[in-house]
Amino acid sequence: MSESVRTNTSIWSKGMLSVIVAQFLSAFGDNALLFATLALLKTQFYPDWSQPVLQMVFVGAYILFAPFVGQIADSFAKGRVMMVANGLKLAGAAGICLGVNPFVGYTLVGIGAAAYSPAKYGILGELTTGDKLVKANGLMEASTIAAILLGSVAGGVLADWHVIAALVACALAYAGAVAANLFIPKLVAARPGQSWRLSAMTRSFFSACVVLWRNGETRFSLVGTGLFWGAGVTLRFLLVLWVPVALGITDNATPTYLNAMVAVGIVVGAGAAAKLVTLETVSRCMPAGILIGVVVAIFSLQHALLPAYALLLLIGMLGGFFVVPLNALLQERGKKSVGAGNAIAVQNLGENSAMLLMLGLYSLAVLVGVPAVAIGIGFGVLFALAIAALWIWQRRQASY
């Protein structure tokens, strides 16, 4: 690590900006690829319940590789780990373009994403510290959500024009992310020299799980972020089903526009969290989490496009304000106890287990014929109750 990298902890340093650009392109590819592949499934006449299964194979890769990716992120320069991971995403997207089964290609993208996540968040704690870390997380989330905004819309719009063109655009985005990773300064590995025996890595990972779960602050963060991202990915698929039922619109683009409104809102909410919430005042984000569920239930009852846009914008704002402080809390506390890479890998296990569970329940509800509006109302109410229970639990733990 160069001395300049050691001392320059500004969130506008060359290293931080390189990370943000690489993250934007990688997240753009992820989101465009999802909607392009969903369009491909439609053209190949897959049933509706198979759509969430596509995301389930993606998150299944996260869960399967969770014991190993944290150590990989901490054992090598994180910028190089990000580059290899984006290379795997590129291979998966290119495979789908060339006719590989979309579920197989998307699984490969999931493996790349699993390796990428601990490195992309872990590197923030190596490039900046303290309350700047909350701001860096806000910048990372804003970049990610901008990519979700543009990637989702690009994927849907291009797929309406030509599905293969949309898939090629995704592959090009991943290629750009690989190139951007080359400009990230090569940092010293956080925890080199660890054992690479699978049994030892598995024990080390589950030991990190235990350490983080026993700490009240990190347990609170793990549960909160798991609930949020599990709900978020389910909402994306709910929109695909809800739009033709509630609005009578059957194209690929409209669900992506609605998802984009959530993305815009998260950018605003993330910025507000960076200014209003510190590591010492994380509990300020909890009312926003409860309101997410309430607004989702109200949204599900809409039958016009304009109020749907407004409510999804509000859901995004609440979501950004809710999740950014929880991410920063876990990174700061986790870095000191088990290493940033391991902390994020444990977080990924929790988030993706929640996604797998929620997507499985959603797919089952669709399979048995539950109406989309009823799914949305039930989903919102249950989410609000879950966050309220988490807040009560956290306050009781803090009082002991």
Swiss-Prot record:
Localization per Swiss-Prot or TrEMBL: Cell inner membrane
Known role: Catalyzes the facilitated diffusion of 2-acyl-glycero-3-phosphoethanolamine (2-acyl-GPE) into the cell.
Record CDD domains: MFS_MefA_like
Gene: lplT
A Pfam short name: MFS_1
Keyword Membrane among UniProt keywords: yes
GO MF term set: lysophospholipid:sodium symporter activity
Keyword tags: Cell inner membrane, Cell membrane, Lipid transport, Membrane, Transmembrane, Transmembrane helix, Transport
Species this chain originates from: Salmonella heidelberg (strain SL476)
Membrane topology designation: Multi-pass membrane protein
InterPro entries: LysoPLipid__transptr_LplT, MFS, MFS_trans_sf
Family in the record: Belongs to the major facilitator superfamily. LplT (TC 2.A.1.42) family.
Keyword Transmembrane helix attributed: yes
Record-annotated membrane-spanning stretches: 19-39, 53-73, 91-111, 139-159, 164-184, 195-213, 227-247, 257-277, 281-301, 304-324, 352-372, 373-393
Protein's UniProt name: Lysophospholipid transporter LplT
Record GO cellular component, one term: plasma membrane
